[in-house]
Amino acid sequence: MAGGQEQAAGPAGAVRLVLATHNQHKVRELRAILDGKVPGLGPDGIVGAGELGATEPVEDGLTFAENALIKARALAAFSGLPAVADDSGLCVDVLGGAPGIFSARWAGRHGDDAANLALLLAQLADVAPEHRGARFTCAAALVTPDGYEHVETGHLIGSLAIAPRGTNGFGYDPVLVPDGDVRTCAELTPHEKNAISHRGQAFRALAPAVVAVLSGQVPAAG
């Protein structure tokens, strides 16, 4: 097993797929997105890395896809189970695509949503509404312990509000207004958000590969 780590015992029985995240918001969101997409895979069959006691690898990739693969490879090796990971972020046009892969730690401390939002809005304080274009991007990766890998990508294009609005979601959801709507992602219901989100797109595209892996239809890599 890669890195000489012992395989995690994990929760008993029904676990068939592990998600490479310690963010419970993401675990719930990804369970909802995959619900019904994989025959025989219920919520109890999907657990997050934190529930297995897995540590987070260093994300030193240069793209969302590279970081998603880093996380999925590490968790597949640790757990001995198929692993799914995503790497996502906000890409702002006038910032040349930043924060991008640094979205979660834009203000310096990883996962400080309030600080990240405050810094971003301060940086855009003098930017007119017509120049506040942005998009969420998500790369979703599936990796099996025997080396099979598959990556899909999704995008949600919109513009940035002047101030945060809404109480749903997480991250930059309170400031991204999807094209064709007047509400921020944080003002959408979870169902509405998952139907259009970058993460929803990427994981729905990944679902057929997950089905194939869990049903034994994907041959071992190499």
Report each predicted region and the residues it spans.
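Anionic-ligand binding patches
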Residues: 2-18, 24-222
